[in-house]
Amino acid sequence: MQLTYDEDQIAFRDEVRAFMADKAQLALGEDARHGMHLTKDEVIAWHKALAERGWIAPKWPVEHGGAGWDPIQVHIFDEEAFAAGMPRLPNFGLNYVGPVVIHFGDDWQKERFLGPIL
């Protein structure tokens, strides 16, 4: 499938691409860039860089610590991360537990569980 991006999406893609190029300086070993297992320190460094940028939870609403991206932005990020050889985001907490707590949890549960997932 070939997508045609509008100007804002192209600007976002360029921003993500620049971020990936900058973060290629992280201590991600050659094995990690080729899909091999990451060390704990590599995972922490990558997640820290994403968290500092506000990109650790692309699909989450901003009010809960996420980036609040739409599906096209998520696709652009995933595509650029893959092209740059960067590791995938962790799935379970960000994609399953967090969204359930955001949707069904009360304020206490959101306060208690969402921060640690990030």
Label each region the model flagged.
Residues 9, 20, 106:
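Residue-level signal for inorganic ion chemistry
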Residues 1-13:
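Intrinsic disorder at enzyme termini
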Residues 25-118:
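Glycine-rich flavin
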